[in-house]
Regions:
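Ribonuclease/tRNase effector modules and their secretory precursors
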Residues: 1-102
C-alpha cells in the first residue's frame, strides 16, 4: 500500500502538482536546500512511516531520499484536499549520504 502511495506522490511531484507550507520553505532555506533537493528527495526516496494527525486524522508520510548532491534528506508530506501533495516540512540529514540506507 505504501508503494502505491509513494508512486502517486512521485507522479504529482513530476507534474509539479504540489505546494509547500511556509514552514517547509523556511526549513529548506535554513538547511541551504533548494526545491530541486526536495523534489529529488521525494523522487529517490522511500516512505519510512505513515503518521496520523491527532486532530484531523489525516495521514502524512515521512520520506527519506537524496538531495541532488547525494546527501540524505527527509520530507514530511500529505495528500491535500485539492489532490496536490502538500510538503509540510523538510530537514537535511547532516553527515548522511544516500537516502535509503536504514
Amino acid at each position: 500500500m505504501l508503494e502505491k502511495i509513494l508512486r502517486t506522490i512521485q507522479e504529482k511531484i513530476c507534474l509539479q502538482q504540489y505546494i509547500m507550507t511556509l514552514h517547509a520553505e523556511e526549513e529548506m532555506e535554513d538547511d541551504d536546500s533548494s526545491i530541486y533537493d526536495i523534489e529529488n528527495g521525494i523522487l529517490t526516496g522511500e516512505i519510512l512511516e505513515r503518521q496520523k494527525d491527532q486532530t484531523s486524522a489525516e495521514s502524512k508520510y515521512r520520506i527519506r531520499g537524496e538531495t541532488v548532491m547525494g546527501e540524505g534528506i527527509e520530507i514530511i508530506v500529505k495528500l491535500g484536499a485539492t489532490a496536490k501533495v502538500v510538503i509540510i516540512t523538510v530537514y537535511a540529514l547532516l553527515g548522511e549520504e544516500g537516502g535509503n540506507e536504514l
